[in-house]
Regions:
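Conserved PLP-binding active-site segment in aminotransferase class I/II-type PLP enzymes
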Residues: 1-69, 73-78, 156, 364-365, ...
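Generic structural signal for small/hydrophobic residues in well-ordered secondary structure
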Residues: 24, 53, 71, 87, ...
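Conserved PLP-anchoring active-site segment centered on the Schiff-base-forming lysine
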Residues: 73-128
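Active-site region of PLP-dependent enzymes
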Residues: 169-175, 182-304
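Conserved PLP cofactor-binding pocket of PLP-dependent enzymes
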Residues: 223-235, 279-283, 320-357, 362-367, ...
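Conserved PLP-binding active-site segment of the aspartate aminotransferase-like
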Residues: 294-296, 303-313, 342-352, 365-377
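Short, conserved charged micro-motifs
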Residues: 313-320, 376-382
Length: 394
């Protein structure tokens, strides 16, 4: 095949740092993979990770759990959301996010997003007025950060609890404030394709002592909460202990040992991702029928993937994506009629009540998604650009 072709799989995962490998080996040598115990050494890996996250964000508390989905479920539950309550959710998100709400027995009400994949503030206000929600679970899906000043103002004005899904924005900020710090809690993911790769895991950050205590207890502390990295006061723990079921959502020692060293090098990886993103954006700008969603000036993003919107009929998009795939650049498309890996959208979720989402549906119809390993070279990015230009440049 003549012309550009990417030889390196975009699904490849950069190597773990040596410190993560050493930490994992130490855990395996000890055979202590469970975070709690009646006779445990001081400073378990999970407790150290919790302290490191709290220090990184400047929060009083961080709670480590077994997945980003569990983090959202526990944050909502611990903030006081109960079965039957309405929880708003922006329509551009991934299945684990409405799944966390459904897991709680609450009702998902979707909110429209604009052409740049950010929550539409007018529709958010309309949904608040109409549905009187208990909470808004704001998903910073694929790293697209909303107008947080507007979101916070609406939530505060109407008494709506704000929980942030920051699975794709560890290291991003709005107006100098990191995502995860705008509401009652921020929820992060440690899944392989995120900024920190522990295979699976989640972190809740919060300054709310009651929320932290409830999350620790519900995650399954076995009354060994004093071994937690950022423990709330005993009075607050005892207030909630009789009322809180053990949902068994703890993070394990192996995942924490792998994750902890990666937090120290987070900004280095995010800088690499930003350079990759900017080079790709610059390379495809000006292509016909194709645009890149705009990032707000107040936002410092932390992209792990790249999105663009194509204004073509479905068959035209399909044909061009086939060209890209043949040349080693597989591109996901949110506009497919059926759900595929990591790209399901609201119309695929039969458990969520349908609602008119004209702006979101218009952008999702042509939304394409490219995974970006953080160690892509400039030459590899240029090859991706060349393949996309070959496919879409006519």
């Amino acid at each position: 095949m003549e012309g550009p072709r990417l030889e390196r799989p975009l699904t490849s995962v950069p190597p773990l740092p040596s410190a993560a490998m050493e930490g994992a080996a130490a855990v395996l040598d000890s055979a202590r993979l469970f975070r709690y115990g009646e006779h445990v050494p001081e400073g378990t890996w999970v407790a150290r990770l919790e302290r490191a996250f709290a220090e990184h964000f400047g929060t009083r508390f961080a709670v480590a759990v077994n997945s980003g989905g569990s983090a959202m479920f526990l944050a909502l539950r611990s903030a006081g959301v109960e079965a039957g309550d309405v929880v708003l959710l922006n329509a551009f998100t991934l299945a684990p996010v409405p799944g966390a709400i459904e897991h709680l027995g609450a009702k998902v009400v979707l909110v429209d997003v604009d052409a740049d994949l950010r929550v539409d503030l007018e529709d958010l206000e309309a949904a608040i007025v109409e549905h009187r929600p208990k909470a808004f679970l704001l998903s910073h899906m694929r790293g697209h950060v909303a107008d947080m000043a507007g979101v916070v103002a609406l939530c505060e004005a109407h008494g709506v609890i704000l929980i942030e899904d920051c699975a794709h924005t560890l290291g991003a900020s709005f107006g100098g404030t990191p995502t995860g710090l705008f509401g009652a809690a921020g929820c992060f993911s440690l899944q392989t394709w995120k900024q920190i790769n522990a295979g699976e895991g989640g972190i809740i950050v919060t300054d709310d002592e009651d929320l932290a205590a409830r999350a620790i207890l519900a995650s399954g502390a076995y009354m060994l909460h004093a071994q937690h990295g950022t423990p709330p006061s005993e009075d607050v723990i005892q207030r909630w202990a009789p009322l809180t079921p053990n949902c068994s959502m703890r993070l394990n020692e192996l995942a924490a040992a792998i994750a902890l060293p990666q937090l120290a090098s987070l900004e280095e990886r995010n800088d690499a991702w930003r350079a990759i993103y900017n080079r790709l954006e610059s390379g495809i700008s000006g292509l016909p029928n194709l645009r890149v969603p705009r990032t707000l000036d107040e936002v410092v993003h932390a992209p792990t993937s790249f999105q663009f919107v194509v204004d073509l009929p479905p068959e035209g998009i399909e044909a061009r994506l086939a060209v890209c795939a043949e040349r080693g650049v597989p591109i996901k498309w949110f506009g497919r009629s059926f759900a595929t890996g990591f790209t399901s959208v609201h119309r695929h979720w039969g458990y969520v009540e349908a609602r008119a989402l004209p702006k979101g549906d218009a952008v999702l119809a042509g939304l394409c998604d490219v995974r970006l390993p953080s160690d892509l070279t400039a030459e590899e990015v240029d090859t991706i650009v060349a393949v996309i230009c070959l496919a879409f440049g006519h």
